[in-house]
Curated annotation (Swiss-Prot):
Catalytic activity: sn-glycerol 1-phosphate + NAD(+) = dihydroxyacetone phosphate + NADH + H(+); sn-glycerol 1-phosphate + NADP(+) = dihydroxyacetone phosphate + NADPH + H(+)
Keyword Membrane belongs to the record: no
UniProt subcellular location: Cytoplasm
Record-listed Ni(2+) binding positions: D192, H272, H292
Protein name per its UniProtKB record: Glycerol-1-phosphate dehydrogenase [NAD(P)+]
Organism name: Halalkalibacterium halodurans (strain ATCC BAA-125 / DSM 18197 / FERM 7344 / JCM 9153 / C-125) (Bacillus halodurans)
Top-tier EC class: oxidoreductase
Chain positions recorded as substrate binding sites: D145, D192, H276
Xref: Pfam families: Fe-ADH_2
């Protein structure tokens, strides 16, 4: 069992913060070269001898085919479900993608193997849950922190909805696959991690002002993952084995923190709300969907600038009173300003994103300036969460 999983299980069982933590059912986590070689033995031990590999054409070529050969050589029955793109659009976690998987899955499957990046895992997570079967995560790119998550973000009728389903029972992160990932997906994973710069502040704000649940141990797990990425940005930018290992470890750590906590608060704040807002706009227009982490990284730049400038000034001069939330903003003014000071400067976030080839301007995402401004004004309404963006738009604008 990997040290990350041991640490997460220890936090889940020993933490005394008062918040009810989720017990982690996952019992195997392998990260390294040839990690996939541990898979056949694991499946035999569990009696899971009929598997369905879920992949797309690219991830099957990179990893799925090798996994299938390995398992067949050890007497395990393998069915392949290769998901296809919808015309000119990339594969999405939507009704079309889910329909392909439901139709293509073998009836006698004991376990699903998600061989791919975020979309493949989201589709496999919700389909396996609906079938009442477990699934195993085999990421092919260090692109998101949701590989270990219970949440499955699915697009339904053009709206992104997160369903709480199930986490994988095991994760095999093989560096032989991960080091082949396109640079854009590495940059996306790094952008997803940089998003914790603002999400951790929003989480503390929501706890302070609105008494939303908080856990110091989960906070420090997520903060450690973020710090590790920022301190090793050069290695990640080089896309060498050590850099990919560190980024993957950070993404897994962040995902386990969310799994323990039972909510996405640690890893998802206003920067993710902007990303979701843009994603739905791209869906409505039929435009090419930028990678999730690319949107999150750029949104983190915007939120940093907004919080450290406009929000700071509004809080410093805030004189409002009335509702419990407004009174709480006034009461915690100094603490709010201290939290804002912990956010990296927008220029520093930009420099880090540039180093890995991430999106640093709206044109990099084919994002209209008007949509950027619109998201800053409206994205806080997508989630019932007391982020600093929510406070700014709903209570501080007129102060």
């Amino acid at each position: 069992m990997n040290h990350l999983l041991k640490q997460a299980k220890r936090v889940a069982s020993e933490c005394e913060c008062g918040h009810e933590h989720q017990w982690i059912e996952m019992d195997e986590l392998q990260l390294g070269r040839n990690a996939i070689n541990y898979l056949p033995e694991y499946l035999h031990e569990k009696g899971l001898l009929h598997v369905t590999i879920v992949a797309d054409a690219n991830t099957y070529a990179v990893a799925g085919q090798l996994v299938a050969q390995l398992l067949k050589g050890r007497g395990i029955d393998v069915e392949n479900c290769i998901l296809k793109e919808q015309g000119a659009l990339t594969l999405l976690a939507d009704e079309h993608g889910l329909g392909q998987l439901v139709i293509g899955a073998a009836k006698e499957t004991d376990v699903f193997l998600a061989v791919g990046a975020g979309t493949i895992h989201d589709l496999t997570r919700i389909a396996s849950y609906k079938f009442g079967k477990p699934f195993i995560a085999i990421p092919t790119a260090p692109s998101v922190d949701g590989f270990t998550s219970m949440g499955a973000p699915v697009i339904r009728d053009g709206v992104k909805i997160t369903f709480q389903t199930q986490a994988p029972i095991a994760l095999f992160a093989d560096l032989d696959f991960l080091t082949q990932a396109p640079r854009s997906m590495v940059a996306a994973g790094f952008g997803d991690m940089l998003g914790k710069s603002t999400s951790l502040v929003d989480w503390q704000v929501s706890h302070m002002l609105n008494d939303e649940p908080f856990c110091p141990a989960v906070f420090h797990m997520t903060k450690s993952a973020l710090t590790m990425c920022m301190e090793h940005a050069d290695e990640i930018a080089a896309c060498n084995e050590q850099g990919i290992r560190l980024l993957t470890e950070a993404l897994i750590m962040s995902g386990l923190a969310m799994l323990i906590f039972g909510h996405s608060h640690p890893a998802s704040g206003a920067e993710h709300h902007l990303s979701h807002y843009w994603e739905m706009a791209f869906l409505r227009s039929g435009g090419t969907q930028p990678l999730h982490g690319a949107k999150v990284g750029y949104a983190t730049m915007l939120i940093s600038a907004l919080y450290k400038n406009e929000a700071r000034k509004k809080i410093e001069t805030f004189q409002g009173e009335g509702s419990p939330l407004v009174n709480s903003i006034h009461k915690h003014r100094e603490r709010l300003l201290m939290l804002i000071d912990t956010i990296p400067e927008s220029s520093d976030i930009q420099r880090l994103l540039e180093s890995v080839g991430g999106a640093v301007k709206s044109a990099d995402l084919a994002l209209a300036d008007s949509l950027e401004d619109e998201a800053l004004e409206k994205a806080h309404k997508l989630r019932e969460r007391c982020t600093l963006l929510y406070c700014l738009n709903e209570h501080l604008k007129t102060s």
